[in-house]
Amino acid sequence: SIYFYLYRLKGCHQIYNPAFMRLNDNIFRANDIRGIAYEDLTQEVVFALGQALGSESIKRNQNNFIIGRDGRISSPQLFAWLSEGVLSTGCNVIDIGIVPSPVFYHSTFNLNSSSGVVITGSHNPADYNGFKILFENRSTSSEEIQAIKQKIIEKDFISGKGKIHSTDIVESYINAIKNDVNLLHSLNISIDCGNGAAGVVAERVYKS
């Protein structure tokens, strides 16, 4: 692994106290960011990632940034650190809660932002987590992931004070499915979401 040692980001002492942070180069994958929660994805790293994403969002004239998450135990804490970083740039956070990735993608077409991130470890073991990032309804390329890393290394962040609010996007997602799918017959089904984020929306979708 290649590690970059960065001095504490100015103005972030209220979020964390270490004098420097360790940034594992291996968390920056081809199209997302992924690593072991609390080991690779530390408070300092995730906060700085939030600063980079918020700064990039504002640069693209997106003053609102959507954040969703999966059901992993580490996801609420990563959300807290990430959202604080985004807010510190003056970018607003739209919290859509625990949602599967398709609902997150739907949100970027139906809320006041086309950019955001879903916190998810995907198929990886329970101690992993990660970040799938969208800007302007597009998944980030490997070049964009590397640019985000460079922002963190250079501390190329905007400063400001954003606001956060929560919204339920699931109802909009349900309506989109209902308008697109017509069942010829009623169905009796059983669902096993395997502890995935779909568990919080599947019953609502099928009952509707």
Locations of regions flagged by a protein language model:
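Gly/Ser/Thr-enriched, mixed-charge loops and adjacent short helices
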Residues: 129-208
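Ferredoxin-reductase
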Residues: 54, 60-136
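Aromatic (phenylalanine/tyrosine) cluster motif
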Residues: 3-7, 16, 20
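Active-site flanking residues adjacent to catalytic metal/cofactor-binding acidic residues
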Residues: 31, 69, 120, 191-194
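An N-terminal, well-structured beta->alpha segment
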Residues: 20-84, 88-89, 166-187
